Amino acid sequence: MLNEQTSEKLYQMKLNGMAEALKDQLAQPDINQLPFDERFSLLVDRQWTWKENKRLDRLLQNAKLKLNACIEDIDYKRARGIDKSVILNLAGCEWIRQIQNIIITGPTGVGKTYLACAMANVACRNGHSALYMRTPRLLQQLVIAKADGTYVKIMNKLAKAKVLIIDDLGLAPLADSERRDLLEVIEDRYELCSTIITSQLPIDLWHDSIGDPTIADAILDRLVHNAHKITLKGGSMRRKKI
């Protein structure tokens, strides 16, 4: 009865991992042979693991990644222009701590979105928040937000994500309001958080794609100068891993 009460109190205090570990210990006939400090250490370790798993689940859920992509699943044998040493170096997340960006370019279907989501996934596993947005949807949401009064809220959300994926930049010409909204998003994050950009267009065509020379200069200056650039090549691998 006492053990049941203790377990229930642990659950009420949201120490679920510790409560589950206690149940496991009580189910072992020889558990009393372990010293108290060892048993307690096992309880704490389980609680720590439970808490970290919950945090990762929350980060991944909030990230809304388009693909369930993992660095470990990347196939380097295919001729896609993926340098394994570069990817493994980025997987250490130092680029996030240094507030650097990643730009992934290449034709459709070569795995740009997969690689971007894999980078965001490993960022979440290292405790960083992330958020995935396709460029058309991002710009559409900002238009709606201006109309319904949630613009500031959405801009704050975009600004606070430690890693923001802006997928498919340059798919279509930008209207003047869209250029300005994109600049505001980039400006709010500049030298504060990291951004991953994917695009079918090579970087040297972005200026013309964005349109207005002054705004294009401002966007590119904030995105490109401190970015790790990855250029993918080859045919479409749609519905396949990289």
Regions found by a protein language model. Name each.
Residues 27, 60-61, 65-68, 72-102:
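Pre-Walker A (pre-P-loop) alpha-helix and adjacent loop at the N terminus of AAA/AAA+ ATPase modules
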Residues 82-160:
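Conserved P-loop
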Residues 12-15, 29-34, 46, 64, ...:
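Conserved phosphate/pyrophosphate-binding and hydrolysis machinery centered on Walker-type P-loop NTPases
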